[in-house]
Amino acid sequence: MDIVNDLVSSISSISSEAAEEEAIRDELRNDKGGLIAGIFVLTLTASFVPWFLTKAKITNLVSVVSILTCLSAGVIIGAGFNHILPDAAEEFQSYVEAVAPDNKYGDFPFAHTITIVTMFALICVDKILVSGGLDGEADHNHMDLSQHNHPSPHAAGEIDLNIYTNGDDDDDDVNEDQEEDSTKDDEKEHGHGHGHGHGHNSSNSSSNGHGHGLKKKKKSKKEHGHGHNHDHSSNGHSHKDEKDSEKVNVSSKSKAWVFLVALSLHSIFDGLGLGSETQKDSFYGLLIAVLAHKFLDGLVLGIAIKYAYFSFKFSCIALVFAAAMTPLGIGIGMAISSAYESSTDAYLVKGIILSITCGSFIYISLIELLPSGLCQKGWPKLKLAVAFLGYSVMAILALWV
């Protein structure tokens, strides 16, 4: 009789555990469905922020984005090493125990190896894309916003992304005033103004005779000599300026393309990890990391696309495409997880997907986000502090999530 009771109790326990796991899967399935729409809207909205702020006079956008970028990098590093990588290693361990518990290679760090291989693969793809020549440049930084610090002069009223050049015009005005005062002093000292002969000008370039001199920089307000000093710079350099402007525009378009491809690839890996995750705590830990940088991803991509001066129609198509990549990855991950749900191969599949996701996290945080945030001028100590803060928060959350 006791044996029968124990058997019934065991069956009931197994049934209750199965029912609980099924309830968790249903809950996560519903959350993932809502997440598909939520992440798409979040990323797309962030991508169009530069257009929303076109008429606003914002002078510190680069500094704000760079600080948030460092914070996001810290969060992603913490999520990768404290959440995703341990879960991936656990999945591989479960697979080995279920299939070949006595295998002598069971303790091999499969998760860590796949993670590092993925990181190097992404670096190789990145460098091959650029060095192969979309614009023929040897080096770049996808998220370096300094290239967008000087928007087109035709875009009047648009955002000034460089807070470190605001004082340049004032300095030029001061220099002009100083040059004008110096010119007046010279006039008084030498006792002649607009006569023939050897004259003086405030830009340290002398003109003989009638003073037909060429100037590389802008003319001083007052000049000595005969007064016939001609400035040929506007005509002589107009074609060169047009070529330089065209070259910069092509470079901006190429970098925007590269960033679009790289970000889309990384977004698919984000979605794969979220879609394949079946553990509630691990899912929400990964979700925090993904949401921490999705807004920034969209914002920086929007800046890159906007200041590459594509047509608005093409920009919309590109941004919608990029925003759809994480939801696409979630859907693929859910399909893979469902296909292997009742098989021991599910451990292997989830372990591989999580390891790839972790590798992409390390790449995007240490290769792209953190260097990009630190390369912008200003607040280096604050940026390092917020990066460590982001990591610390995710490390502490690993105690419960």
UniProtKB/Swiss-Prot annotation:
The keyword Heme does not apply. GO terms for cellular component: plasma membrane. It is found in: Membrane. Keywords: Ion transport, Membrane, Metal-binding, Transmembrane, Transmembrane helix, Transport. This is Protein zntC. Residues 141-247 are annotated as: Disordered. The keyword Glycosyltransferase does not apply. Belongs to the ZIP transporter (TC 2.A.5) family. It comes from Dictyostelium discoideum (Social amoeba). The lineage of its organism: Eukaryota, Amoebozoa, Evosea, Eumycetozoa, Dictyostelia.
